[in-house]
Amino acid sequence: MSVENPIDQTDLTFFTNEEGHSLLSRFKSTLKDTQLFDALVGYFRASGFYQLYDALEPVEKIRILVGLSIDRDSYDMMQYHQELGMIDYESHQRTKKKYQGNLKEEIENSDENDNRLEIGIRKFIEFLKADCQDPVIDKAFNGNGKKLEIRAYPSKNIHAKVYIGKFKPEDRDYGFVITGSSNFSESGFVANREFNVELRSKRDVLFAENQFNTL
């Protein structure tokens, strides 16, 4: 049995990727005013970076923590287990190299006929190499001096999908938190039916920010 209640189509709290309510559209709207953007996700795909890179261009600092969903026992069954056995404890430099390799493999194995994945990979690597525009904010968050940092989270149990944006000081709002079902991918941002909610109170954003900074 299906019962549908009337909803406000202008609601900007929930994002399901239905028409007019895609997570990608919301990011494109809010990231233009964002100074610091953090993402804690189960997995990362070049397709997602392609969808978002233009909106991320003006963001001064981007930090991505990726939780690997495959467990240690599964790694042991793989031929390259020795390389992946340290993934839970990789430094930024090793993680960066690993994900660059994974993204190149993704484009080689893709059936897509266009160059979207190639652009996503190129922009991803470009952001990794670019200097952070604001050394002060980079130092405040113990950054490495670059626009984009990516690390593997040191736990095999992480399933969170959380996106945190901190606005520029002159903005009337502090920032936003979006959490729900969407991973950092085209499917999560546009294609799949998802369920995400955005929180705007400073208290919620600070809580999420503090949790992220402890990882």
Show where each model-derived region lies.
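PLD/PLD-like phosphodiesterase catalytic module centered on the HKD motif
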Residues: 1-215
